[in-house]
Amino acid sequence: TRLLDGLGFISRNNRKRWTKTPDTRIEMPDYPERAAQECLVNALAHRDYLEFGSEVHIDIFDDRMEFYSPGGMFSGWKVQDLNLDRVPSIRRNPIVADVLGRMNFMERRGSGFKQIREDYELAANWQAGLEPVFYSDQIGFWVTLYNLNYGYDVELETTQAHNGTTQAQNVRKDDVN
């Protein structure tokens, strides 16, 4: 299915950085997995299926992942003009949304924006200024998820003398050059 193919594409392209603490290993994916899944599920659930020849797109760049869904908000509003904490749930395709809910891909109504933003803010590698961006017009709906690991391509190994463990220290590419 398009959903499973899309989730596979996201998973294959979602690299992980990690750091080791004295007790555990902390994985830090480029994109919070639940946030990316939520974007794809919502793009499929709320797209305008009457736009023949158009489809949901997932485009991955070095610094971001962009989701495009045909058709703007069903209400005609522009998401960038709204308070994301108070956007009412209006489903363009209630049957599709119901099926996705029964398959445990969708949660309660109207929780998508909040879930995506919370997943970013709770990520171990969260940085201010990398908040997800939502944009819509009458033609489509776009979500931009920023790569939380962009610029952290170099890992230097340092040895901690006091306990003999090795810990990965993440260094931005800009710091090395």
Name each model feature, range by range.
Residues 1-177:
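C-terminal regulatory or interaction extensions
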